[in-house]
Each structure stands twice: as structure tokens, then as C-alpha cells.
Amino acid sequence: MITIDERDARPPFEQIREQLTDQIRSGSLAAGTRLPSVRQLAGDLRLAAGTVARAYSELEADGLLESNRSGTRVREVEPIPAEAREAARAYIDGVGVGSLDDAIRVLRVEWGNR
């Protein structure tokens, strides 16, 4: 299920993109799962069709979705193991950085120090 948080500073297309990415990577959305049409999801979320189309397009470019005349489906991707997701959550909760970019910068520095 996709939800849009109007208080979130991120644009709606990015919220859709991130939620679908998480669902695909966690295995909640299995390979071959057909997603709602752009118009259907836009109507359900009360968004412009172009907003949903942009999210789908970016997910397709990321290799997570494939579209054809019969619709948009989840591609086969290797899910991120539950242990890795749990470790990431613990890191996010404990690191005390302000943004994803800050967290990535910290990881890059520490990765280089290995």
C-alpha cells in the first residue's frame, strides 16, 4: 500500500518511489506482481497522473519495474536480507545524522577506513 504524507518535505513522486523500492527490495512485492495503472494509482492517491508516471519511470530506470502494453510489473531483483535491513535501521536510529546524504557520507568515510 502506498500513502502520501502531505507533511513530508519530499515530493509525492519521491515518496511513491521510495515506498515501492522498499516493498520490492524487502520482498513484499514479488517479481511479476502487476502494479496499478498510472491513472488508477493517481486516482487512488489523488495525485496527477504525471506524478505517478514519474515515479514508475524512475523505478523502471533503476531496474525495479518493467512496463509494456499489458501493464507495469515488478522485475526480478535480489531482495536485501532481513539482517541487513535490521542493521540499517539500527544504524539510522543510532547515528544521529540529519539526512540520508549525511548518513551516506559517514558510511563512505568509514568504508574507506576499512
Question: Model segments located where?
Answer:
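Short, Lys/Arg-rich nucleic-acid/phosphate-binding segment
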Residues: L35, S67-V77
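A short alpha-helical element within helix-turn-helix/winged-helix DNA-binding domains
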Residues: R34-L45
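Short, hydrophobic-biased segments on the C-terminal half of alpha helices
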Residues: Y56-S57
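Extreme N-terminal segment that seeds HTH/winged-HTH DNA-binding domains in transcriptional regulators
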Residues: M1-R34, E83-R114
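Short beta-strand(s) of the beta-wing in winged-helix/HTH DNA-binding folds
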Residues: A30, E60, L65-E66
